[in-house]
Amino acid sequence: MPLLNSVTTPYAEALLQVVNENLQTEEMVSEVKQLLELLNDSPELEKALSSPILETEAKKKIIIEIFSNKVNSSLLNFLKLLADRQRIGILTSILNRFLEIYRENSNIALATVTSAVELTDEQKGLITQKIVNIAGTQKLELVTKIDPSLIGGFVASVGSKVIDASLASQIRKLGLSLSK
């Protein structure tokens, strides 16, 4: 998505610059993650904000109504700016790009761990230690997902690196070796 990045990056960098100046970076990162979760959980809201039928003022009214008590003033003003500039339709992409740039600047690796069952805190800690060694970074943001089809074990991915320690993968490999 290089073309989309060329549109989202300036907005994401501008938001990061504002929060860095106001020393609100950690707070903003938390709010952006919550906002992304909200948008993910309510596709109707995202469709309404993306709709070309709704006027800019109507979109701003929706933004104020829904977010004025949930986000800080910097983020609220940013959302209204995106509505004014007809960019609110790519809000999710802009917020994801903001988080990417934040992680790059803070040297934080993003790891996704998919397991067959919910991981305990101890398991998350052990996996985090292993991934930190592989990724070569001191900080790691861990996103966990559940996929019962793995049967057991986990699959971890950091950037282009994938560690497949799932039982399903081992069974598949065993089946391939037996079929030869």
From Swiss-Prot:
Among its keywords, does the record have Membrane?
Answer: yes
Question: Where found, per UniProt?
Answer: Cellular thylakoid membrane
Q: Which GO terms describe its molecular function?
A: proton-transporting ATP synthase activity, rotational mechanism
* InterPro entries, A to Z: ATP_synth_OSCP/delta_N_sf (IPR026015), ATPase_OSCP/dsu (IPR000711)
- Listed SUPFAM superfamilies: N-terminal domain of the delta subunit of the F1F0-ATP synthase (SSF47928)
Main subcellular localisation: membrane
List keywords of the entry alphabetically. Answer: ATP synthesis, CF(1), Hydrogen ion transport, Ion transport, Membrane, Thylakoid, Transport
Q: How does it sit in the membrane?
A: Peripheral membrane protein
* UniProt keyword Nuclease, yes or no: no
Q: Which domain of life is it from?
A: Bacteria
Report one GO cellular component: proton-transporting ATP synthase complex
**Functional note:** F(1)F(0) ATP synthase produces ATP from ADP in the presence of a proton or sodium gradient. F-type ATPases consist of two structural domains, F(1) containing the extramembraneous catalytic core and F(0) containing the membrane proton channel, linked together by a central stalk and a peripheral stalk. During catalysis, ATP synthesis in the catalytic domain of F(1) is coupled via a rotary mechanism of the central stalk subunits to proton translocation. This protein is part of the stalk that links CF(0) to CF(1). It either transmits conformational changes from CF(0) to CF(1) or is implicated in proton conduction.
| Family of the protein in this entry | Belongs to the ATPase delta chain family.
Quaternary structure (record): F-type ATPases have 2 components, F(1) - the catalytic core - and F(0) - the membrane proton channel. F(1) has five subunits: alpha(3), beta(3), gamma(1), delta(1), epsilon(1). CF(0) has four main subunits: a(1), b(1), b'(1) and c(10-14). The alpha and beta chains form an alternating ring which encloses part of the gamma chain. F(1) is attached to F(0) by a central stalk formed by the gamma and epsilon chains, while a peripheral stalk is formed by the delta, b and b' chains.
What NCBIfam families does this protein map onto? ATP_synt_delta
Q: Could you identify this protein by its name?
A: ATP synthase subunit delta
